[in-house]
Every structure is written in C-alpha cells, then in structure tokens.
C-alpha cells in the first residue's frame, strides 16, 4: 500500500516538473502580444485554454508568458522558423 502511494506521488511530481513554460505564439510564429504588463486577464485566459493546458499566464516583455503548458503547445521561438514566416 505504501509503495502504491509513493509511486503515485512520484508520477504527480514528474508531471509537474515536466510541464513547460514559455511565450505563446500566433499563427505567424511571433509572440502573442500584450500591453498591460504583469497580471493580465487576456494572457491568463489564453494560457488556460483547454488545448494549451497552461496553469497560469501573464504579460512579460509585451508577450503572453505561460506556465505549466502541455508539451504539444508551441512556444516562442519556434525552431527553424522566424517570426513572420521568413
């Protein structure tokens, strides 16, 4: 019984540690813009969308930064792709 609890706790911790953070990208591969720095309802809403799986979002450096994103969510900078597709 104790072993089962320890294994479950480890799996939960691994899932938390492996969640990724980063800037959201738009369709052109650029950071999603925001203008109200710090706590930002728009960024928080965008990060928590079901298909992104983020836990929290805020505006940092005029871009929406998300914590706890799923691995499948693309973040800026995209590998081998520049902002604007060039």
Curated annotation (Swiss-Prot):
Gene Ontology CC annotations of this record: extracellular region
Main location: secreted
MF terms (GO), sorted A to Z: sodium channel inhibitor activity; toxin activity
Keywords on record: Disulfide bond, Ion channel impairing toxin, Neurotoxin, Secreted, Signal, Toxin, Voltage-gated sodium channel impairing toxin
Signal peptide feature range: 1-19
Occurrences of domain LCN-type CS-alpha/beta (ranges): 20-84
PROSITE patterns to which the protein is assigned, alphabetical: LCN_CSAB
The organism's place on the tree of life at top rank: Eukaryota
InterPro entries listed in its UniProt record: LCN-type_CS_alpha_beta_dom, Scorpion_toxin-like, Scorpion_toxin-like_sf, Scorpion_toxinL, Scorpion_toxinL/defensin
GO biological process, one term: defense response
SMART domains: Knot1
SUPFAM superfamilies found in the cross-reference section: Scorpion toxin-like (SSF57095)
Disulfide-bond pairs as recorded: 30-83, 34-59, 43-64, 47-66
Annotated transmembrane regions: none
CDD domains reported for this sequence: neurotoxins_LC_scorpion
Subcellular location(s) of the protein: Secreted
Tissue occurrence: Expressed by the venom gland.
Domain comment quoted from the record: Has the structural arrangement of an alpha-helix connected to antiparallel beta-sheets by disulfide bonds (CS-alpha/beta).
Function: Beta toxins bind voltage-independently at site-4 of sodium channels (Nav) and shift the voltage of activation toward more negative potentials thereby affecting sodium channel activation and promoting spontaneous and repetitive firing.
Family of the protein in this entry: Belongs to the long (4 C-C) scorpion toxin superfamily. Sodium channel inhibitor family. Beta subfamily.
The protein's name in its UniProt record: Toxin CngtIV
Annotated organism of origin: Centruroides noxius
